Regions:
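Active-site/acyl-donor-binding loops of N-acyltransferases
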Residues: 2, 7-11, 34, 60-61, ...
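A conserved beta-strand-loop-helix scaffold within acyl/acetyltransferase catalytic domains
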Residues: 3-50, 56-67, 109-114, 119-136, ...
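Short, high-confidence coil segments that cap the C-terminus of an alpha-helix
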Residues: 40-42, 100-102, 270-273
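Glycine-/proline-rich flexible loop or hinge segments
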Residues: 67-80, 100-106
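Short histidine-centered catalytic/ligand-binding loop motif
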Residues: 72-83, 193, 247-254
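Aromatic (often tryptophan-rich) hydrophobic motifs at membrane interfaces
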Residues: 87-97, 204-316
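Short catalytic-loop micro-motif centered on adjacent basic/acidic residues
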Residues: 104-107, 173, 274-278
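Conserved beta-strand-loop-alpha-helix junction that forms the acyl-donor binding cleft
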Residues: 107-116, 278-285
Length: 339
């Protein structure tokens, strides 16, 4: 069987393949468009045997300092069947090397750590990497379950807070206008300052809202026209994925963050998604809040890299230190700009 890698330049065709392969929303065209506006270049490719499409991947390419040239990264991809994984990855690695001169092909698949995909990834010459972008330890809910089944896995206090919020006069609905989006950004800044995490510039979030459209719903808790809390997601046909969330001081007092999370679950189920991914668990207060919504955790495969250059060992040692330095510089700049 002769395989080839073919670029895809049509948005509708591409997003159709994402849904066909039950792909992740970070593989959607609109997500790539946003990353392409903020430091990456984007290449969407299909792996074909001339008769059938065996797999596909949205490649994000980042230029690196000399002599490394480039990193090719696939967020929550590629997309293919378990039986085709090794062949698809081999084709993608060859393409990443010849077309983009990558020092490595880095993938963070939307596959369970103990799924049949795992040995196929290793067989394709990939190795685990500590250069993680998307956290593999997460919480994924099955939205095929009923309200009662979902709530049964929550803590008693969480159920009580949800029911109280849903009985209140707060209106839980999707954010629709640019003015409402600006309220979202205001609360996100407030939440980031309170919790001490870094965020992008506002234009990044406005671009997500514009480029993904219905593929990036924001569920808000409104008191009249005033936003109190939000959950911002991206979604494909199969999966809803939390991107961001925030709550105002007043929203905290009313505990509407419980209600808005529940409203987001129901909205994504109504939109036809079968999975709801809380997007990572750490050992922090935000993760403690997430863990109140289920009794289990999920572990995805994590980050795997295929070396494409003799310089890969140097890159693999240098990259973690470089990322830490960049993150420290961003935190410093943020503190300076607040003064």
């Amino acid at each position: 069987m002769s395989l080839a890698v073919v670029p895809c330049t049509d948005r509708a065709v591409w997003d159709g393949y994402v849904d066909r392969f039950q792909g992740h929303p970070q593989q959607l065209w609109g997500w790539g468009e946003t990353k392409g506006m903020h430091g990456w270049s984007v290449d969407r490719v299909l792996v074909t045997d001339d008769e059938n499409i065996l797999g596909c991947a949205q490649l994000l390419v980042r230029k690196l300092p000399f002599p490394f040239r480039a990193l090719v990264y696939v967020p929550r991809g590629p997309m293919c069947s378990a039986g085709d994984t090794t062949a698809v990855l081999a084709q993608l690695a060859g393409y990443a090397s010849s077309r983009h001169h990558g020092v490595a092909l880095s993938i963070e698949p939307d596959w369970d750590a103990e799924s049949p995909f795992a040995p196929a990834v290793a067989a394709a010459g990939f190795r685990p990497s500590a250069n993680t972008v998307l956290i593999p330890r997460t919480l994924i809910l099955d939205l095929a379950r009923s309200d009662d089944e979902l709530m049964a896995d929550m803590s008693k206090s969480t159920r009580a807070n949800i029911r109280k919020a849903m009985r209140s006069e707060v209106d839980f609905r999707k954010v629709q206008t640019e003015a409402e989006l600006e309220q979202v950004l205001g609360i996100y800044h407030e939440t980031a300052d309170r919790a001490g995490f870094g965020i992008h510039e506002d234009k990044y979030y406005r671009d997500i809202f514009a480029n993904l459209g219905e593929g990036s719903p924001i569920i808000g808790a409104f008191d009249g026209e005033q936003l109190l809390a939000f959950v911002w997601l991206s979604r494909s046909g199969a999966t809803a994925f939390e991107l961001y969330g925030g709550v105002s001081a007043e929203g905290q007092k009313q505990r509407v963050n419980y209600g808005v999370k529940w409203a987001a679950l129901l909205a994504m189920r109504e939109d036809g998604c079968g999975r709801y991914d809380f997007n990572g668990l750490l050992n922090d207060g935000i993760s403690d809040f997430k863990k109140q919504f289920a009794k289990h955790e999920n572990l995805l495969m994590g980050t795997w890299e295929k070396p494409l250059s003799p310089l890969y060992p140097v890159y693999a040692r240098a990259m973690p230190a470089a990322r830490k330095g960049l993150q420290a510089a961003r935190r410093l700049m943020k503190r300076v700009t607040r003064r």
